[in-house]
Amino acid sequence: MSALATASGSPRPSLRAPRARKARRYPLRAGAVVDVIQDGPSMAARIAWVSARLMIRPALSVGSYLPSAPWPWGVVEFAARAITPPPGTVRAGIGLVHCTAQLVRAAAVLPADGTRRVVLYLHGGAFLTCGAHSHGRLVSMLSSFADSPVLVPNYRKIPKHSISDAIDDCYDGYSWLRRKGYEPDQIVLAGDSAGGYLALALAQRLLECGERPAALVAMSPLLQLATRPKTTHPNIGSDAMFPPRAFDALHGLIARAAAHRDADGHSDALYEPLDHLQPGLPPMLIHVSGCEVLLHDARLAAQRLATVSVPVDVQVWPGQMHAFQLAAPMIPEATRSLRQIGRYIREATG
C-alpha cells in the first residue's frame, strides 16, 4: 500500500468504469517540460508586490513566532463574504460528507449536468484558512474563461483537522461530480498554493482507484512540505509574502495536526506527493511567480513529473506576488494567467 493510502485511508474503489479517453489537442509530449517566462510585471503588479511586502510579510513573520496561538483563521473567509462576485455569477451550496462545497458558474456558463466539462477547485490558504468566498472572484473568472462550472469544497483545516482529512473532503467533492454524471476525462483538478498540494495528492489517490482526470492545474503551488529547500532558496529574499520562519511554523502545525489524527488507531504520516509520483498521472500546468519561494516546488515538480513521463507546462511570471491570480482583474497579468488556464482546461477536456 502506498504512503498516501497509509496517510489518508485505503484507496476507495473506482466509482465507475472509465470510458474511452479522447485524444487531447494540446501539444505536450510525455516527459516533456515546457518552461515559459512571461513578460515583466505591470505597475499594478509592482504596487501589489510592495503592498504584500509591507503588510502581509510582517504579519506572517510575527505570527510565525506563535503559530499555535488561537489565531482567528476563520475571520478571513467570514470577511470575504462581503466581496461581491462578478455580475451574473450563480452560486449553489452543496453538502458533502464532512464539509460543505460551493458550485459556481459564471454568467452564460451552462449548469453542471454531467455533460461537457467541470473543474474541482481546491483553494489555498496554508491548509489553515480561506474558502469559497475568499477565492470567489478567482473561481468565477476561471469558470468564465474555462466555460465550465467549478466545485469548491470547503475542506476541513488544520490545526483542528489533518491534511489527510482535507484530502478525504476533496475526494468526496470528486465523488460528488462523478455521481452527477461526469467522467474522469471531463474533470480538471485545480488549486492554488496549498490547494496545489491537495490537487496532486488527490490525483495520486484517484490513480490508485483507476481514475485519471483530464488535467491538473496549479497556481503558486506548495508541493513539498519539507522546509529547508525553501528557506535556503535564493527567492527567500524577494518573496513578497513569506519570511523563512513561516515555512517552519506551518510545518510544525501540520505535523501536530497529523499526530492528533486517529486513523485506524494510528497517527498520520506526513505525505510528500513529489516522493510518490507514478506514470499515468494527468498532464499538469503550473503558473508561478518568478520571485516567490514556491518557484522551487514548481520546478522540482516539473523535473520529477518528467521522469515518470507526465507532461508538464510551467509558466513563470516575473515580479508577481504569491497566488497573484487572486488579484484579478486588478492586476492585468492575473487576468491573463486565468485566461491561459481557462484555455488549457478547454483543450484538456476537448
Q: Which functions belong to the PLM regions below?
A:
Residues 99-350:
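Alpha/beta-hydrolase superfamily serine-hydrolase fold, recognizing
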